[in-house]
């Protein structure tokens, strides 16, 4: 017993290599700002993919301004119910098989219906109580949803189905809402509104980019996702420029500071060769933690509040940065990979990806730290 206590004591205070610091006050600020910008809509907070990498349970618990939650998978919905969430939950991809339907009934989970197979499963099921259904319309993205020419037949069958709670609800999804000059979005809005005009059920069209850029798409419900976490859906503006606060700050620290001479290379493949005598910092984070291996030389990192470029290929557990010849940084000093002072959007742009991918790909090696 004494040995066990000693072992636990020795591991309680060790320094984690990488930590994602989640600012729950920033989350609540962002939700309030969404409500101000879509004052006539109810808010369905999208918390799929572990709350966009921020922690499903913590996000749901502190998203007090949300009227409902949207998830992609049934297991995400069940996690929410297990941690005490009683607000409505919608399966945005719908159920995958007829065997899922009793689980939806038991746990009061709403579902999207987007295809003939789901409709047939609903018609053939024997359920204790009806399920709230959102009919997904393919208004132009051509990923999920019933085509406009199928719409009326689906509506009639869903209205006749005793397993469907009335009134039926309606939704669609934009393909290019983040591109202000793209003609596709106005066409999608026009088509969706024309199909659902006069319907009794509630409707939802706008996700993050839609609710921010296309006010006419703010219907009875909006579905904020990435913007809720303080990350912009737009390629030309950060969330901070839109008034939102980044919720996640990804941190690590220097584990070595090394002198590198002009002409010497650093890292696997010798992809970076120093042009001058300099100091290189080694940071304890890599692709094993979810930081992209594809990050090229020059990708910015903050060390002691100053931007420095990645120098050399990202490895599994480490990455290296050029601190400069006059650097005074030391082992143990803080490094920020993205956060309030280094937007994830900027980092993603250097890497050639989107910030959505950065925040959702962190692995279990990264410590999650929450402040409220």
Swiss-Prot record:
* Upper lineage: Bacteria, Pseudomonadati, Pseudomonadota, Gammaproteobacteria, Vibrionales
Cofactor names from the entry are:
pyridoxal 5'-phosphate
Which species does this protein come from? Vibrio vulnificus (strain YJ016)
Question: By its UniProt entry, which NCBIfam families does this protein fall under?
Answer: alr
Pathway given in the UniProt record: Amino-acid biosynthesis; D-alanine biosynthesis; D-alanine from L-alanine: step 1/1
Give the CC-aspect GO terms: cytosol
Cite the binding residues for substrate: 143, 316
Q: What is its EC number?
A: 5.1.1.1
Q: What positions does UniProt annotate as the active site of this protein?
A: 48 (proton acceptor), 268 (proton acceptor)
SUPFAM superfamilies with a match to the protein in the record: Alanine racemase C-terminal domain-like, PLP-binding barrel
As its record notes, the protein acts as a catalyst of: L-alanine = D-alanine
Q: Quote the InterPro entries the UniProt record gives.
A: Ala_racemase, Ala_racemase/Decarboxylase_C, Ala_racemase_C, Ala_racemase_N, Ala_racemase_pyridoxalP-BS, PLP-binding_barrel
Q: Which UniProt keywords apply?
A: Isomerase, Pyridoxal phosphate
Under Pfam families, the record lists: Ala_racemase_C, Ala_racemase_N
Q: Which domain of life is it from?
A: Bacteria
Known Gene3D superfamilies for this protein? Alanine racemase, Lyase, Ornithine Decarboxylase, Chain A, domain 1
**Job of this protein:** Catalyzes the interconversion of L-alanine and D-alanine. May also act on other amino acids.
What biological-process GO terms show up in the record? D-alanine biosynthetic process
Q: Which residues carry this modification: N6-(pyridoxal phosphate)lysine?
A: 48
* Name of the protein described by the UniProt record: Alanine racemase
Q: What SMART domains has UniProt attached to this entry?
A: Ala_racemase_C
Query: Which GO terms label this protein's molecular function in UniProt?
Result: alanine racemase activity; pyridoxal phosphate binding
């Amino acid at each position: 017993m004494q040995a066990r206590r000693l072992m636990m004591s020795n591991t309680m205070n060790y320094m984690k290599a990488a930590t994602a610091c989640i600012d729950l006050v920033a989350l609540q600020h962002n939700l309030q700002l969404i409500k101000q910008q879509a004052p006539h809509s109810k808010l369905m907070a999208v918390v799929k993919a572990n709350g966009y990498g921020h922690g499903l349970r913590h996000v749901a618990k502190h998203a007090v301004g949300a009227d409902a939650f949207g998830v992609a998978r049934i297991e995400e919905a069940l996690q929410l119910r297990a941690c005490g969430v009683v607000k409505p939950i919608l399966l945005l991809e719908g159920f995958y098989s007829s065997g899922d339907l009793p689980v939806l009934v038991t746990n009061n989970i709403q579902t999207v219906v987007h295809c003939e197979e789901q409709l047939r499963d609903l018609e053939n099921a024997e359920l204790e109580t009806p399920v709230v259904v959102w009919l997904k319309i393919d208004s132009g993205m051509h990923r999920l949803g019933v085509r406009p020419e199928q719409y009326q037949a689906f509506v009639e069958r869903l209205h006749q189905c005793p397993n469907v709670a009335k009134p039926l609800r309606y939704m669609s999804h934009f393909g290019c809402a983040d591109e202000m000059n793209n003609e596709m979005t106005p066409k999608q809005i026009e088509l969706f509104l024309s199909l659902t005009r006069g319907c009794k059920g509630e409707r939802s069209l706008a996700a993050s980019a839609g609710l921010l850029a296309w006010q006419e798409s703010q219907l009875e419900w909006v579905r904020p996702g990435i913007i809720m976490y303080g990350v912009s859906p737009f390629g030309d503006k950060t969330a901070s420029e839109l008034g939102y606060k980044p919720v996640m700050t990804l941190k690590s620290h220097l584990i070595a500071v090394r002198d590198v001479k002009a002409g010497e290379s650093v890292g696997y493949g010798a992809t970076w060769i120093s042009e001058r005598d300099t100091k290189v910092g080694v940071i304890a984070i890599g692709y094993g933690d979810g930081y992209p291996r594809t990050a090229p030389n020059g990708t910015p990192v903050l060390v002691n509040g100053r931007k420095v470029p990645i120098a050399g290929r990202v490895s599994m557990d480490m990455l290296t940065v050029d601190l400069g010849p006059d650097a005074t940084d030391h082992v143990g000093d803080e490094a920020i990979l993205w956060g309030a002072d280094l937007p994830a959007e900027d980092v993603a742009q250097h890497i050639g990806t989107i910030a959505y991918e950065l925040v959702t790909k962190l692995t279990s090696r990264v410590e999650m730290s929450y402040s409220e």
